[in-house]
Amino acid sequence: MIAGLYEDLCQRATAGRPIRLALIGAGTFGGMAIRQCLRVPGIELVAVADLDIIRAATALRDAGVNQERLAFSAPTRDDSIVVTADAEAAIALEHVDVVIEATGSPLSAVRHIRLAFAAGKDVVNVTVEADALVGPALSAEAASLGLTYSLAYGDQPALICELVDWARVNGFDVVSAGKGTLHKPGFEWTSPDTVWTRYGMDATQADAAGYDRRMFTSFVDGTKSAIEMAVVASATGLAVPKAGLGFLPVGIDELPSTLRPRHAGGQLERSGIVEAVSAIDADGEPVANDLRWGVFVVVGTDDSDVARCFRDYGLTTDTTGKFAALWRNNHLVGMELMTSVATVGLLGRPTGVPKSHCAEVVAVAKRDLPEQMEIDGEGGYTVFGKLMPAENARSEGAVPIGLARGLRTARHVSQGDLLTWDDVDEAGPDDIRTLRESMFNNVAVSA
């Protein structure tokens, strides 16, 4: 993270020129962001939009905002926060500098992001599913308008991008980079009915706490990891595993020995690639010193002096000393989002941005799908998302997981089969197809 941001924010506060935010989506991530932004000088929340206006107002009140500050129409005082179900109205507010998109709905997110661009607003996008679908097209549109478009710091993709950037700036070769999660073979078939057992949670307690079964299903079945690693590949230029993520059961001590290429004794197909590691092994047993909530980068060197420094300065290395791992064992989601807001609002720089269309997250059947079955999309009963190189996905006519919801099968699809456009009746929304075609014209081919 860039040093000096807090001092600059304090100066903006003193000068009466705070970075003014409109938040679209007041769910878990948005609620965390609300709590923290209220504590930061130089950042001012001026609008919250959510289809559930009661949820938006509750999130603000729970964060300590007085009822008198909530404006359900036009602002009535200088410190009013507009609360609305109309995202477009919140985005259009003249004094908004940065829009935070946090709905979690990829198609809605694309619409909101493009509305923000049309209104001349910078955007921090929390809805990573939109970036996996059309991120490079969105970043290109922002650049053409002189605007900043950014991944959300606090989510794992932006934190991984930070580690990769650190490694490259300091002259290290990036061997692999990725995230931790909870996954083992068979978890890809997880449904909302089985998710709490797989996740290790009591179903009654999880439901009582209001946890979203579909969201947690997407975590457990591997879809969310595939989406996030697709975005990391797009933002960093790292390659995508041809067979999809391996979800290797690896603790932090084994990162440099396992997350290196096969020719060097590891388990990766090549150097310079994304991957995910699991906190449990194939039998469901816990991995020692797991990285379930964290992120990592493995760097390599052929320079014996650099390898010696890896050892002398306490890095975890493989037995050769040529590969070393650095990691962060947590991520604080919406509680860290103001890092992106400050970086975008003060410097006009993103905390990671999708650039190249090198990765795709495609839909794979979780069960046998009969003809005319409606696909329920990410985190549902019918499909999970698998990471693929973009050129492979297009050559096979694969349906992206972000466009799968609501489609109907035109023929029987067997469990484990890739869902292709020939398997369904529809072709997806016209505006999204246009954006995707613009990416295909600049597709990046994985080595």
Kindly label every feature range from the protein language model.
Residues L51-I53, G104-S105, T127-D131, G154-D155, ...:
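Short, ordered loop/turn segments at secondary-structure junctions
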Residues M1-L115:
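N-terminal glycine-/serine-/threonine-rich beta1-alpha1-beta2 phosphate-ribose binding loop
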Residues A142-A143, S150-V220:
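Rossmann-like NAD(P)H-binding beta-loop-alpha module
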